[in-house]
């Protein structure tokens, strides 16, 4: 981000960070602005657990004012995207709750869940099974995932059959195939 900010600043172009899925950790509420972003957009849904059609726009006052000019009660392009008073109250409550969560404890809880899953899956014919953190793509980065490397030949099924069987299970399991 720092390199993008440097290049954008040389050209007087504002940097807008789509941080919709960058929570947790809570420190991300400030980190992108600290690194020089001009605007940062967070989802009010997702990990914040507020109303799904809400969000938080943070950043430079002049850019916030320009965005606000597009919203209710004005007739800008954002008029159709207004949120109700009830949704705003829900978002405020969700944000207050979100910042009070002990995310270190949550992360440990997630790791324990992953360890249980990993233990239950050890009987599957796979070439590798581990707990890992995403380095790209999947968000948020602090959420651990159970990673399996499956050899379809060893299982006697192709990847689409495996995916289909997992999706139809109880509970359903969504997979990302690389």
What positions do the PLM features span?
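Conserved PLP-enzyme active-site core in the AAT-like
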Residues: 1-103, 118-122
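Residues that cap or flank secondary-structure elements
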Residues: 20-21, 109, 154
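Active-site-lining helix/loop region of Rossmann-like oxidoreductase modules
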Residues: 99-124, 129-133
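Conserved C-terminal alpha-helix-loop-beta "cap" of PLP-dependent enzymes
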Residues: 122-178
